[in-house]
Amino acid sequence: MIDRQKVISELISPNTSKIVLLVMDGIGDIPNEEGLTPLQKANTPNLDALAKKSDLGQTIPVLPGITPGSGPGHLGLFGYDPLKYQIGRGILEALGINVEVGENDLVARGNFATIDGDIIVDRRAGRPSSEESAKVVEILNENIKEIEDVKITFYPGKEHRFVVKFTGEGLMDKLEDADPQKEGKPIKYTKALDESSKKSERIVNILLDKIKEVLKDQPKMNFALLRGFSKHPDMPKFGDVFKLKPAAVAVYPMYKGLAKLVGMEVVEAGQTIEDEFNTVKKLWNEYDFFYVHIKKTDSYGEDGNFDSKVKVIEEVDKFLPILLELNPDVLIVTGDHSTPCVMKGHSFHPVPLMIYAKNTRRGLSKLFNEFECARGSLGTIHAVDVMPLALAYAGRLEKYGA
């Protein structure tokens, strides 16, 4: 099998160009009852002006018809084949909040949830504040310290999210998610996918029962869903593969974790879109690749909140001149997957892609939205091809062959 990363890496000729990868999480959508997507509805003069000078297309994050998680969606954009590198969400969330993960550790991402009896009625427990969630994490740490010979530690994340770390011998990560993924479904326990993970299955399921008992008097955060069980994987570093000095500008822990996993330097980004863009401006001379992550487009898509998704897109557009004034050699605007508001979740639909550079076939597109991207000059490509294109537009790839 051809090692795409190796082929690209051997063609790279470093220069002084700057590349910005702006990921609007879950940006792709499908029309609502008015026949519009949030990108079509949004007032985006800056993105639309950029489209006239850019090459547009759409990406397939994994394979046609496959609905990707955020991990595979991002790995593809970073130039890693998501079918080769299968990463659990737990390690991403853990690294994102600076949890040390050793060789005897198994980690999982947790969602606080609300149950009525054994039925999940709210998978996010009403989206509590991070402060409220941290108090419940403290209760769990006080009451659940060990199961058999395995140490249990809980770590607070943002809002309803947390991380649980299992430390002990013989813990493997081939486990089903302990999350039914939908409300109105009964509690779901994990199952081992092979014999090596039977111990992990037993420990996790005992933990779920203990969490239920400890939190039974909590008004909303009275249960937890666990998913993305994972050990620490071994991966080539982004900077070594692509000969770039990368910085990650992200607010949410999981995306910081993704960046750390591939060796990007995670920088302090503030909390708002304006903060993130100003962080890029502040550090412009220190790095030559910037990954910038915008979360709320995905959050509002999952909530089915069309108008709020539109507002986030408009906010990105409002502050886009901060990035444009830096005059990047390559600016990529895309998403890691589609999150249609009408579906309230990730979907298999292709993802809008726009690449601005000085050497594009400008003039073919007039707007930035799903339909302009579908007929754009780049066509439909795999997300894993975005990084080679970025390097090519930046003048960093030599000719292949004689």
Curated annotation (Swiss-Prot):
Function statement: Catalyzes the interconversion of 2-phosphoglycerate and 3-phosphoglycerate.
Chain segments annotated as transmembrane: none
Name under which the protein is recorded: Probable 2,3-bisphosphoglycerate-independent phosphoglycerate mutase
Record PANTHER family: COFACTOR-INDEPENDENT PHOSPHOGLYCERATE MUTASE, METALLOENZYME DOMAIN-CONTAINING PROTEIN
Top EC class, one word: isomerase
Coiled coil segments of this chain: none
GO biological process: glycolytic process
Biological source species: Thermosipho africanus (strain TCF52B)
Single Gene Ontology MF annotation: phosphoglycerate mutase activity
EC assignment: 5.4.2.12
Catalytic activity: (2R)-2-phosphoglycerate = (2R)-3-phosphoglycerate
UniProt cross-references to HAMAP family, sorted A to Z: ApgM_B (MF_01402_B)
Keyword field contains Isomerase: yes
Pathway: Carbohydrate degradation; glycolysis; pyruvate from D-glyceraldehyde 3-phosphate: step 3/5
Keywords per UniProt: Glycolysis, Isomerase
NCBIfam families given in the database record: apgM, PRK04135.1
Superkingdom assignment: Bacteria
Family affiliation: Belongs to the BPG-independent phosphoglycerate mutase family. A-PGAM subfamily.
InterPro entries for this protein: Alkaline_phosphatase_core_sf, ApgAM_prokaryotes, Metalloenzyme, Pglycerate_mutase_ApgM
